[in-house]
């Protein structure tokens, strides 16, 4: 069975806010990485409205984007990270 998605819990060190980073396959050649602000138990506050979302075309790009966002959200201010992507 092929992997269908990734899921990471992230605690932002500068702001102490919690986020959930999720990458899922939407179509055969379309992946979506979404960042949700989370509560203390790492449950997203708004399931239908992610705070940030990026679409990629290949699985490798999606996985790289997922791990890149996870690493940056741990160390940098979220607004700064979200501003850098269209």
Question: For each predicted feature, which ranges?
Answer:
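Short intrinsically disordered terminal tails
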Residues: 1, 79-86
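A short, exposed loop/beta-hairpin motif centered on an aromatic-Gly-Thr core
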Residues: 44-64, 68
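Alpha-helix capping and helix-coil boundary motifs
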Residues: 1, 58-61, 76-77
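Short N-terminal "domain-start" leader segments
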Residues: 1-35, 39-40
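Short arginine-rich
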Residues: 67-82
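Histidine-/acidic-rich catalytic cores in large beta-rich domains
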Residues: 11, 31-33, 37, 51-59, ...
């Amino acid at each position: 069975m092929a992997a269908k998605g990734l899921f990471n819990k992230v605690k932002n060190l500068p702001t102490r806010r919690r986020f959930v980073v999720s990458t899922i396959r939407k179509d055969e050649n379309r992946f979506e990485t979404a960042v949700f602000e989370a509560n203390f138990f790492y449950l997203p506050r708004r399931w239908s409205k992610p705070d940030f979302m990026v679409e990629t075309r290949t699985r490798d790009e999606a996985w790289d984007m997922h791990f890149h966002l996870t690493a940056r959200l741990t160390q940098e201010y979220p607004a700064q990270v979200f501003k850098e992507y269209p």
